[in-house]
Amino acid sequence: MPQISRYSDEQVEQLLAELLNVLEKHKAPTDLSLMVLGNMVTNLINTSIAPAQRQAIANSFARALQSSINEDKAH
């Protein structure tokens, strides 16, 4: 069952494209990109989520990330 979001596909795609452009502009390798994006997620959780909810949000985010990973062997 598809997820229903309060954000339009256009909003999500535009923000994603802008973030990817920044990483490409800085020629960030995959490991640096993942480190920076992970730090951004941590910062958002720590500064925007109530302390009592942070662990649950982090767990939910981790599950969503794991479920979205493609198991295709192609690299």
From Swiss-Prot:
InterPro entries: UPF0352, YejL_sf. It comes from the Bacteria. Gene3D superfamilies: YejL-like. SUPFAM superfamilies: YejL-like (SSF158651). One of its GO terms (cellular component) is cytosol. HAMAP family: UPF0352. NCBIfam families: PRK13689.1. Belongs to the UPF0352 family. This is UPF0352 protein YejL. It comes from Escherichia coli (strain K12).
